[in-house]
């Protein structure tokens, strides 16, 4: 009996223990009215989360452990943005935090700009999430690291807020500079900026070099300089822009909308420079359109000019300037619309690329007419006094700012060349291997093709007339050689002194041994003449340019100074001939030697294979080429020095278009700092790095083929 009662008691204990275990493992079901206020709110939030799929309550993020983990994860995110983006995608798949507002049902186009930017950027989204709940925000020591993160650059500021259309139009209307003034002041500012940068880097080089600092010292310096970084960003060197308040021209960072938005405190210095470069392209186009419109309204459409000029003369003088004006107006309108979309400019090179490919052919037509335009203008000034007086009267109008009529006629050619340089300026500042870099490279390539077509159009017109004029002046003593050819043009012409007679009779007293001869050097032919009365030239020898060899004589006294030997491996009589020629100066001798037979070791060497530490100069005074072998210089041009003479001439290569030629050294100043020279070369390599390899290979093959034929 007692045994049975003990068994029943044991069963009862087991049953109560089992019931107690089940009760502990079941979810607590408590009535809401019995809960305190805080617990009731938590229960309501829990009910909302139960209705939403894949939701969870966030953990306590403000603990010491989680803050340390968060720092490490942010550092990894900065080093590997792709992984950060994938982690963000996974977290969005798993669910949203209760502290994050649900915006999935809001259309993308109607979302607030700041929210759109923050959702686009993982770092900005995390910053918003952490700062939305008290106690879960990022600590102050984390803010500098977050501000320096690459994710807070353009990606985080893609959608700030648009500039009002009226505000932007007022800005365009307030640009009081004509393009001629804008261009001159802009290039002068660029020269001055390079001088300052050269001086700053040179001062830093004279001090303790940064490369000698240890990593720990560099980190300490970065930490010390970090709080003062926002003021330094505002005092960045201005790039190619006008900062004179009297010019009624503003920088991008000086716009009221930019200053009030606070983006200058968020954007990195390189991004601000990029914004300034894109802003300069837009505002310079507005200034160019203003000057072009003045050419049409003030000069071309003047009733008195229409009465004086014949329709054919007016057509040659103004060409298709109306087409150029229409393209510029549409181009500027699209740039304005892009500026109105956002105070932080996303890109402008895509618009430049589209117009360069589809619409800028009007520039080729206008510029190709430049030779006839200049000649017609000179003839009208000489032959029609009424036209000359009227132009002088119109130039005195305050609208023209004292600028001559000829400066308005060359506006399209100046603009298309300057536009390519502005795109280069943007290309130097965009992120490498980014979409904006690809767009800038495409735009630059299209503009380069347009500029080359313009140059070829001008050269073709002038070369044809020049060859016809030379052909009329030549009389052949030997077998006649056809001069006029579509593939032939003049490289250099001039007078030299030939030393004749046997070597034993070449004494310093027999000055009659020197005879004057005249040389015409074409790109594929050398013609040696004697000048005869009547402005004629008698040809007595010729040879293909590829069969010429030159040799400089050693210094043999004042009389034989500047003397070199010219060898014709096969002349007009199919024989070898040698000429000892004397030039008037050392520079003239070197220029003839360079033109007659370029250094065959460097003639076919590509630009990128040259020495990095090459002497460089920048143009500080414009120079117009006087001879075919000279190079026309524009302000702020950077050139590599390939050769120079003691009497002040330099043979150089311009970096932005790789054109070669001679120019006076007084027009330039040397860049002494090697860091600046290296930076200029690196920027040049980056601009030209995306050239078509197949095209370059075919070009090199053609050059090598021509060398073999020579």
Curated annotation (Swiss-Prot):
CDD domains: PH_ephexin (cd01221), RhoGEF (cd00160), SH3_ephexin1 (cd11939). Highly expressed in brain specifically in caudate nucleus and to a lower extent in amygdala and hippocampus. Also detected in lung. GO terms for cellular component: cytosol; glutamatergic synapse; growth cone; membrane. It comes from the Eukaryota. Residues 1-11, 26-41, 687-699 have a biased composition (Basic and acidic residues). GO terms for molecular function: ephrin receptor binding; guanyl-nucleotide exchange factor activity. Residues 1-273 are annotated as: Regulatory region. It is found in: Cytoplasm; Membrane; Cell projection, Growth cone. Residues 612-673 form the SH3 domain. Residues 1-143, 194-236, 687-710 are annotated as: Disordered. Src-dependent phosphorylation at Tyr-179 upon EPHA4 activation increases the guanine exchange factor activity toward RHOA. Phosphorylation by CDK5 upon EPHA4 activation by EFNA1 may regulate dendritic spine morphogenesis. The keyword Cytoplasm applies. Residues 89-102, 127-136 have a biased composition (Polar residues). Residues 489-601 form the PH domain. One of its GO terms (biological process) is regulation of small GTPase mediated signal transduction. Residues 273-457 form the DH domain. PROSITE patterns: DH_2, PH_DOMAIN, SH3. Acts as a guanine nucleotide exchange factor (GEF) which differentially activates the GTPases RHOA, RAC1 and CDC42. Plays a role in axon guidance regulating ephrin-induced growth cone collapse and dendritic spine morphogenesis. Upon activation by ephrin through EPHA4, the GEF activity switches toward RHOA resulting in its activation. Activated RHOA promotes cone retraction at the expense of RAC1- and CDC42-stimulated growth cone extension. The DH domain and the PH domain are both required to mediate interaction with EPHA4. This is Ephexin-1. The lineage of its organism: Eukaryota, Metazoa, Chordata, Craniata, Vertebrata.
């Amino acid at each position: 009996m007692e045994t049975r009662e003990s068994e029943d008691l044991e069963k009862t204990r087991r049953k109560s223990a089992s019931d107690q275990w089940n009760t502990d493992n079941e979810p607590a079901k408590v009535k809401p009215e019995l809960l305190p206020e805080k617990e009731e709110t938590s229960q309501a939030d829990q009910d909302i989360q139960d209705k939403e799929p894949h939701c969870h309550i966030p953990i306590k993020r403000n603990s010491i452990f989680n803050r340390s983990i968060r720092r490490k994860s942010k550092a990894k995110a900065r080093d590997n943005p792709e992984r950060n983006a994938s982690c963000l995608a996974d977290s969005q798949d798993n669910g949203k935090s209760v502290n994050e507002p649900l915006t999935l049902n809001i259309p993308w186009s109607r979302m607030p700009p700041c929210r759109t930017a923050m959702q686009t950027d993982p770092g900005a989204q995390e910053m918003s999430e952490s700062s939305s709940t008290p106690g879960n925000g990022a600590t102050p020591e984390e803010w500098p690291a977050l501000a320096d993160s690459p994710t807070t650059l353009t990606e985080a500021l893609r959608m700030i807020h648009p500039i009002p259309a009226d505000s932007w139009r007022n800005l365009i209307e307030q640009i009081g500079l004509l393009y001629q003034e804008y261009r001159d002041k802009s290039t002068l500012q660029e020269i001055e900026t390079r001088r300052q940068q050269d001086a700053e880097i040179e001062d830093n080089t004279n001090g303790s070099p940064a490369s000698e600092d240890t990593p720990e010292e560099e980190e300490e310096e970065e930490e010390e300089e970090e709080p003062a970084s926002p003021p330094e960003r505002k005092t960045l060197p201005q790039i190619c822009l006008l900062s004179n308040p009297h010019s009624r021209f503003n920088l991008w960072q000086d716009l009221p909308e930019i200053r009030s938005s606070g983006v200058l405190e968020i954007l990195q210095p390189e991004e601000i420079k990029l914004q300034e470069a894109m802003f300069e392209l837009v505002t310079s186009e507005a200034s160019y359109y203003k000057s072009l419109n003045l050419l049409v309204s003030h000069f071309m459409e003047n009733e008195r000019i229409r009465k004086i000029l014949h329709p054919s003369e007016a057509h040659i003088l103004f060409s298709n300037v109306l087409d150029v004006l229409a393209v510029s107006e549409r181009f500027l309108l699209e740039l304005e619309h892009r500026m109105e979309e956002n105070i932080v400019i996303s890109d402008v090179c895509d618009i430049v690329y589209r117009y360069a490919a589809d619409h800028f052919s009007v520039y080729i037509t206008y510029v190709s007419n430049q030779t006839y335009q200049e000649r017609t203008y000179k003839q009208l000034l000489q032959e029609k006094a009424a036209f000359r007086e009227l132009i002088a009267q119109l130039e005195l109008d305050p609208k023209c700012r004292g600028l001559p009529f000829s400066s308005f006629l060359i506006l399209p050619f100046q603009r298309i060349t300057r536009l390519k340089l502005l795109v280069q300026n943007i290309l130097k500042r965009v992120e490498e291997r980014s979409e904006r870099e690809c767009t800038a490279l495409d735009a630059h390539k299209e503009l380069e093709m347009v500029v080359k077509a313009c140059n070829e159009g001008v050269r073709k017109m002038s070369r044809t007339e020049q060859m016809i004029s030379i052909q009329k002046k030549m009389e052949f003593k030997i077998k006649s050689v056809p001069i006029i050819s579509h593939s032939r043009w003049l490289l250099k012409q001039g007078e030299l002194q030939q030393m004749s007679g046997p070597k034993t009779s070449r004494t310093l007293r027999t000055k009659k041994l020197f005879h004057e001869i005249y040389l015409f050097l074409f790109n594929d032919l050398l013609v040696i003449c004697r000048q005869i009365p009547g402005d004629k030239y008698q040809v007595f020898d010729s040879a293909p340019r590829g069969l010429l060899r030159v040799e400089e004589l050693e210094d043999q006294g004042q009389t034989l100074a500047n003397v070199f030997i010219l060898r014709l491996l096969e002349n007009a009589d199919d024989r070898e001939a040698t000429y000892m020629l004397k030039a008037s100066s050392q520079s003239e001798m070197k220029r003839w030697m360079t033109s007659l037979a370029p250094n065959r070791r460097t003639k076919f060497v590509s630009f990128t294979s040259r020495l990095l530490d090459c002497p460089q100069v920048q143009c500080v005074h414009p120079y117009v080429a006087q001879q075919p072998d000279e190079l026309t210089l524009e302000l702020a041009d950077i050139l590599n020095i390939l050769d120079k003479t003691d009497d002040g001439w330099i043979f150089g290569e311009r970096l932005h278009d790789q054109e070669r030629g001679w120019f006076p050294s007084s027009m330039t100043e040397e860049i002494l700092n090697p860091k600046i020279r290296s930076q200029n070369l690196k920027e040049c390599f980056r601009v030209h790095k995306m050239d078509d390899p197949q095209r370059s290979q075919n070009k090199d093959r053609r050059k090598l083929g021509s060398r073999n034929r020579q």
